[in-house]
Amino acid sequence: MPTINQLVRKPRKSKVEKSKSPALNVGYNSHKKVQTNVSSPQKRGVATRVGTMTPKKPNSALRKFARVRLSNLIEVTAYIPGIGHNLQEHSVVLLRGGRVKDLPGVRYHIVRGALDTAGVNDRKQGRSKYGTKRPKA
């Protein structure tokens, strides 16, 4: 326990909260070619690479991912949720935050049903999370 005098000399420091999705907290001014300090809930980007990767132990699968260059010129890895997708190189995608626990380095999700990304076909439940329209009765 510090003495009052020690606290007067060197006060307590508050913890710095680190963002879990840092690329969404950076804007870009293309006229001045300078990064700005503007946060956004989603960001648009262009897929530069689409592929699969294997998860950490103890899981086993081929998880779909895309390497995306965002509108603020930062390049990140994003997960493609749902069964099947139509993404390829140069597809324009919308990104949201949210990591994938068993894929190291994947801190973002691609929003299904927005921009060039199609919704998941034949999905009946939880459709809003996968950009699927209501089926005709």
Curated annotation (Swiss-Prot):
<dbReference type="GO" id="GO:0000049">
    <property type="term" value="F:tRNA binding"/>
</dbReference>
<comment type="similarity">
    <text>Belongs to the universal ribosomal protein uS12 family.</text>
</comment>
<keyword id="KW-0689">Ribosomal protein</keyword>
<keyword id="KW-0694">RNA-binding</keyword>
<dbReference type="InterPro" id="IPR006032">
    <property type="entry name" value="Ribosomal_uS12"/>
</dbReference>
<protein>
    <recommendedName>
        <fullName>Small ribosomal subunit protein uS12</fullName>
    </recommendedName>
</protein>
<keyword id="KW-0687">Ribonucleoprotein</keyword>
<dbReference type="GO" id="GO:0003735">
    <property type="term" value="F:structural constituent of ribosome"/>
</dbReference>
<dbReference type="GO" id="GO:0006412">
    <property type="term" value="P:translation"/>
</dbReference>
<dbReference type="InterPro" id="IPR005679">
    <property type="entry name" value="Ribosomal_uS12_bac"/>
</dbReference>
<comment type="subunit">
    <text>Part of the 30S ribosomal subunit. Contacts proteins S8 and S17. May interact with IF1 in the 30S initiation complex.</text>
</comment>
<dbReference type="Pfam" id="PF00164">
    <property type="entry name" value="Ribosom_S12_S23"/>
</dbReference>
<feature type="region of interest" description="Disordered">
    <location>
        <begin position="1"/>
        <end position="57"/>
    </location>
</feature>
<keyword id="KW-0820">tRNA-binding</keyword>
<dbReference type="GO" id="GO:0019843">
    <property type="term" value="F:rRNA binding"/>
</dbReference>
<comment type="function">
    <text>With S4 and S5 plays an important role in translational accuracy.</text>
</comment>
<dbReference type="GO" id="GO:0015935">
    <property type="term" value="C:small ribosomal subunit"/>
</dbReference>
<dbReference type="InterPro" id="IPR012340">
    <property type="entry name" value="NA-bd_OB-fold"/>
</dbReference>
<keyword id="KW-0699">rRNA-binding</keyword>
<comment type="function">
    <text>Interacts with and stabilizes bases of the 16S rRNA that are involved in tRNA selection in the A site and with the mRNA backbone. Located at the interface of the 30S and 50S subunits, it traverses the body of the 30S subunit contacting proteins on the other side and probably holding the rRNA structure together. The combined cluster of proteins S8, S12 and S17 appears to hold together the shoulder and platform of the 30S subunit.</text>
</comment>
